[in-house]
């Protein structure tokens, strides 16, 4: 077909290709195959498919279709083959959105596959029953990705909405908005939860004592006494034990209201137990946060609550009690909205390390690492039970608070925490020395102590950032390995395909050479026979007897029949040669398409490698700066320790 020629499909061609008689209805047709040939290639469908309402399978491969207008009538179509056509835009692909029964579509070797990066996700999102696209099965992960990529507001129901989506483009904040809405759902507390928390707070964490039993004057007197004691005195370990047990008692009382809790455990099992303050305070605080998270689940997790309380009891019974005063700052504080803020493990641990009086920052950090490791090992069983319970329920409770909410208040509490730790350190030094309040007014000592505390906090934050950087490096290395494996697999596929096509091309060339040799040989024989025929005719003219002439004519006629048969065979060979030449051209075009695809993949890999290299260099530079910072901190702390001893 000449380039640029317009060939529209008509009903006569449909009847001719399908073998349907002129008096039969086109609605009876179930399958239609009209692949393109070297002489004719369809460019437009027109209205030829209007009456094929029951068609299930349509093959229009190897044509030159530039538009799919007219395919919307095939409402029952399940399989569509448009391999090696000229569809170049998603606007034409969008014409398939009315064919809701489509299960198998093939757009390979169409310009739209190469030009549109979101082509596959678009088709998967547009056709809900699609099972196979471009000779590849549609995975569930691709459906989820298409749903995230094309949000519900990108409606495909009208052509106006679709054109707007194509011209304007997708909003960049779409995924962030989806993430924010899902995060908001996880942070919402029911009105019942708010009421229960307010009631427990008003009852002084004891539901047996209603808020109405205490007079206002008595409340004011107790509040004044509490603040007076908090300003200068320290709490005993029993008070800390009581505070850590409040959360467990709150969960136990809430279970009593609904299902009477765990009947096999005593009320003491719901508390944190006696806290071993040398090594157990961080564990107790961590257990308190863990238990608060468990009790905020629905009432259906009684088994998990019992298991966690039993784990806490067994953990507390293995420790020994060593009393040590703890400041009132480490009690859990009530936040606005009915939520409670619990001191973190590092706050409790930093206070204990200063109360025990370690000789250097290295000893403090080593002890903190050991205690955090013990706390994580001791609580692994309860966390596993909690994860198993959440998995069995299938969905997460929206009332479970994210750990990011607890860490959001750390910058605001840093100054108050520093003051509390400094007060505890000064009180301990005053009790150990003869005087009382001797260092509270010493500005030089206060400045040095504050600097030491801030250095410790900066070191802890730097160590956390280093761990995050290591996780990022590990993730990038894993992603790099995945990309390399994918590239190796694609290169193997490309090599196998090229090898196969090269072998087919060589076989075709050999067949062409053989056919040419046969053709040359046949032409030589034909010319030789013609010369013989000419000689025989001359001899016949000069012959005397009619008998000899008759015999010669009979022989010549037989020779002519044989020659005509050979000529027919030669014509068939020539037609076969033309078909082989067309197949060779198509193979060459497919080979060029594969080469361009491979070059595109190599360019993407090089860009990914360059980006990965830049990120690794940035992380290495950050790690070197971190090492320099950590190398300076011990030197400063040892120098200041020498000044204090002087």
Swiss-Prot record:
Molecular function in Gene Ontology: identical protein binding
Any Pfam family hit: LRR_9
Keywords from the UniProt entry: Coiled coil, Cytoplasm, Cytoskeleton, Leucine-rich repeat, Phosphoprotein, Repeat
Biased composition (Basic and acidic residues): 383-392
Region (Disordered): 300-342, 357-399
Bias kind Low complexity: ranges: 307-319
InterPro entries hit by this protein: CEP72-like, Leu-rich_rpt, Leu-rich_rpt_typical-subtyp, LRR_dom_sf, U2A'_phosphoprotein32A_C
LRR-type repeats, residues: 28-49, 54-75, 76-97
Positions carrying Phosphoserine: 117, 236, 380, 402
Coiled-coil stretches noted in the UniProt entry, renumbered to this chain: 476-622
LRRCT domain mapped to chain residues: 110-149
Record bears the keyword Phosphoprotein: yes
Major localisation: cytoplasm
The organism's place on the tree of life at top rank: Eukaryota
Location(s) in or outside the cell: Cytoplasm, Cytoskeleton, Microtubule organizing center, Centrosome; Cytoplasm, Cytoskeleton, Microtubule organizing center, Centrosome, Centriolar satellite
SMART domains associated with the record: LRR_TYP (SM00369), LRRcap (SM00446)
GO BP annotations, alphabetical order: centriole replication; gamma-tubulin complex localization; regulation of protein localization to centrosome; spindle organization
Purpose: Involved in the recruitment of key centrosomal proteins to the centrosome. Provides centrosomal microtubule-nucleation activity on the gamma-tubulin ring complexes (gamma-TuRCs) and has critical roles in forming a focused bipolar spindle, which is needed for proper tension generation between sister chromatids. Required for localization of KIZ, AKAP9 and gamma-tubulin ring complexes (gamma-TuRCs). Involved in centriole duplication. Required for CDK5RAP22, CEP152, WDR62 and CEP63 centrosomal localization and promotes the centrosomal localization of CDK2.
Subunit structure: Interacts with KIZ, PCM1 and CDK5RAP2.
UniProt record similarity statement: Belongs to the CEP72 family.
Protein's UniProt name: Centrosomal protein of 72 kDa
Gene coding for it: Cep72
């Amino acid at each position: 077909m000449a380039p640029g020629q317009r060939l529209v499909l008509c009903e006569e061609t449909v009847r001719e290709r399908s073998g349907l008689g002129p008096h039969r209805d086109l609605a009876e047709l179930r399958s239609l195959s009209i692949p393109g040939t070297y002489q004719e290639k369809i460019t437009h469908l027109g209205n030829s498919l209007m009456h094929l309402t029951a068609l299930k399978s349509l093959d229009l491969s190897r044509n030159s279709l530039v538009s799919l207008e007219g395919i919307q009538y095939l409402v029952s179509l399940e399989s569509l083959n448009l391999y090696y056509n000229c569809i170049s835009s998603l606007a034409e692909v969008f014409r398939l959105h009315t064919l809701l029964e489509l299960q198998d579509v093939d757009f390979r070797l169409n310009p739209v596959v190469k030009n549109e990066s979101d082509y596959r996700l678009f088709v998967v999102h547009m056709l809900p029953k699609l099972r196979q696209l471009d000779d590849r099965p549609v995975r569930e992960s691709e459906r989820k990705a298409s749903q995230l990529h094309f949000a519900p507001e990108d409606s495909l129901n009208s052509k106006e909405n679709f054109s707007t989506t194509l011209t304007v483009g997708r909003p960049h904040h779409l995924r962030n908005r989806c993430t924010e809405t899902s995060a908001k759902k996880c942070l919402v507390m029911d009105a019942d939860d708010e009421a229960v928390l307010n009631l427990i707070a008003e009852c002084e964490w004891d539901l047996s004592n209603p808020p109405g039993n205490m007079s206002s004057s008595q409340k004011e007197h107790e509040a004044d006494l509490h603040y007076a004691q908090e300003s200068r005195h320290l709490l005993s370990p029993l008070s800390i034990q009581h505070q850590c047990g409040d959360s467990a008692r709150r969960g136990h009382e809430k279970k009593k209201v609904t299902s009477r809790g765990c009947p096999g455990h005593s009320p003491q099992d719901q508390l944190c137990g006696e806290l071993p303050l040398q090594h157990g305070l961080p564990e107790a605080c961590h257990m308190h946060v863990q238990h608060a998270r468990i009790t905020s689940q629905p009432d259906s997790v009684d088994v998990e609550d019992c298991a966690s309380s039993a784990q806490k009891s067994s953990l507390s019974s293995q420790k020994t009690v060593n009393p040590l005063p703890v400041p009132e700052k480490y009690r859990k504080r009530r936040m606005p909205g009915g939520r409670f803020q619990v001191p973190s493990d590092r706050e409790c641990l930093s206070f204990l390390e200063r109360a025990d009086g370690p000789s250097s920052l290295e000893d403090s950090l080593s002890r903190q690492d050991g205690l955090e490791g013990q706390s994580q090992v001791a609580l692994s069983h309860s966390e596993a039970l909690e994860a198993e319970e959440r998995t069995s329920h299938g969905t997460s409770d929206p009332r479970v608070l994210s750990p990011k909410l607890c860490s959001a208040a750390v910058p605001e509490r840093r100054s108050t925490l520093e003051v509390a730790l400094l007060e505890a350190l000064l009180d301990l030094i005053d009790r150990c020395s003869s005087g009382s309040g001797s260092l509270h007014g010493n500005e030089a000592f206060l400045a040095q102590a504050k600097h030491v505390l801030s250095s410790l906090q900066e070191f802890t934050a730097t160590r956390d950032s280093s761990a995050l950087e290591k996780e990022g490096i590990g993730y990038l290395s894993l992603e790099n390995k995945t990309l390399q494996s994918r590239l190796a697999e694609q290169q193997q596929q490309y090599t196998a395909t090229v090898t196969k096509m090269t072998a087919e091309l060589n076989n075709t060339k050999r067949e062409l050479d053989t056919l040419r040799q046969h053709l040359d040989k046949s032409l030589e024989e034909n010319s030789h026979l013609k010369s013989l025929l000419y000689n025989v005719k001359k001899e016949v003219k000069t012959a005397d007897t009619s008998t000899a002439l008759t015999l010669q004519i009979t022989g010549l006629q037989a020779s002519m029949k044989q020659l005509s048969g050979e000529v027919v065979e030669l014509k068939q060979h020539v037609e076969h040669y033309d078909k082989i030449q067309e197949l060779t051209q198509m193979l060459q075009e497919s080979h060029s398409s594969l080469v361009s695809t491979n070059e595109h993949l190599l360019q993407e890999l090089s860009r990914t490698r360059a980006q990965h290299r830049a990120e690794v260099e940035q992380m290495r530079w950050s790690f070197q700066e971190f090492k320099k910072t950590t190398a300076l901190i011990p030197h400063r702390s040892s120098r200041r320790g020498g000044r204090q001893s002087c």
